[in-house]
């Protein structure tokens, strides 16, 4: 299953500038997904991280992985229109190399477990086939806030 940006926006509450996934490829509900983030110089975080040497903050790479995991969790859980996935934990995070403008992040998420509404994922981020970051991520569903 492939999800384009409008499909992703139906599953996740994130919007610009914090929606960090452009497309999800090879989504297998209850198992795994591969997300794509095209990193451009127009990203707002590059203004301050770092001027003259733009590097995508590691925490945003983790967030991009979490968003792919959130989409997998949403598809796996089924009818959750009144709820949204919340990122609840990070374990074993490692950053292997910087990510910058022009890079295409490939975000590979594997669902390790899903019990009592807690989803645990193994996430890895690659650029050109090279591992740039990895982490274990956790998420739960909670009611969508009433605006």
Curated annotation (Swiss-Prot):
Matching InterPro entries: FabA_FabZ, FabZ, HotDog_dom_sf
MF terms per GO, please?
(3R)-hydroxyacyl-[acyl-carrier-protein] dehydratase activity
Q: What is this protein called?
A: 3-hydroxyacyl-[acyl-carrier-protein] dehydratase FabZ
Organism, by scientific name, is Syntrophotalea carbinolica (strain DSM 2380 / NBRC 103641 / GraBd1)
Q: Which residues form the active site?
A: 49
Q: Its catalytic activity?
A: a (3R)-hydroxyacyl-[ACP] = a (2E)-enoyl-[ACP] + H2O
Q: EC top class, in one word?
A: lyase
HAMAP family recorded for this chain?
FabZ
Q: Which UniProt keywords apply?
A: Cytoplasm, Lipid A biosynthesis, Lipid biosynthesis, Lipid metabolism, Lyase
Using the record, list the residue span of the signal peptide; answer none if the entry has no such feature.
none
Superkingdom of this protein's organism = Bacteria
Q: EC annotation?
A: 4.2.1.59
């Amino acid at each position: 299953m492939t999800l384009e940006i409008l499909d992703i926006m139906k599953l996740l509450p994130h919007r610009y500038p914090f929606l960090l996934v452009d497309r999800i490829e090879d989504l297998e509900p209850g198992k795994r997904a591969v997300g794509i983030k095209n990193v451009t110089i127009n990203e707002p975080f590059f203004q301050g991280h770092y001027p003259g040497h733009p590097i995508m903050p590691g925490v945003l790479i983790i967030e991009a992985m979490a968003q792919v995991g959130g989409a997998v969790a949403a598809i796996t859980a089924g009818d959750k229109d009144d709820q949204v996935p919340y990122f609840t934990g990070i374990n074993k995070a490692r950053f292997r190399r910087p990510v910058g403008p022009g890079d295409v992040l490939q975000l590979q998420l594997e669902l390790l477990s899903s019990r009592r509404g807690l989803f645990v994922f193994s996430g890895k981020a690659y650029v050109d086939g090279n591992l740039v970051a990895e982490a274990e991520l956790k998420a739960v569903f909670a009611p969508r806030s009433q605006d």
